[in-house]
Amino acid sequence: MDKNKIEQKKPGLNQKGVEEDSPLRLTADLEGNYLLDERTSEMKWLGIFYSPAGGSVHRVAKMLKKKIGADKVDMFCVNDIQAGKLLDYKNLILVCSSLGRSTWEREQRDRWAKFFPGMRKISLKDRFVALVGLGDHVTYPKNFVDGMGYMAELVTGLGGTLVGKTSTDGYVYEDSTAVIDDLFVG
């Protein structure tokens, strides 16, 4: 992924690397706790989209929904919907695993891989998108959370605005396409 292709707004960052002016503020600590501020918890019309079903990604999507408020969030597994469903929401959270572009393009078993062609046909202009990537730095140290990096490239290419960055401090890995300016894109 060409790191210059991802265009992100550069609002002020606080000491944790979180955007101050972002409408959606989501960060994670090293234990996997997802932290939301009060502005985020007051939002409505937020869609969480995840894959694969079951396992850690699904668990994290459910944790986010509960933390934000089940009455304020709709949650979908991409296995069960068409990409146009993203257009029903101004604010999106996309939750994925560590796998990267080469795996998604090679193995069509991955539901995100089947979802992406439909996504490429829509515009995410005026949409705010937070990315959550679950990574395994032991098994994938050379492409840690690359799936999130690929999603960032796709979302910005479709006109979406990425929100919510996480500091790389404390993470152990060799390389990741999800890092820009020493911050994870989600």
Describe these PLM feature segments.
Residues 80-82:
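Short acidic active-site motifs
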Residues 16-33, 38:
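Short, low-complexity intrinsically disordered segments enriched in A/P/G/S/L with frequent Arg
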Residues 37, 41-45, 56-59, 67, ...:
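FMN-binding flavodoxin-like domain, especially the glycine-rich phosphate-binding loop
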Residues 51-55:
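Short polar catalytic/cofactor-binding loops
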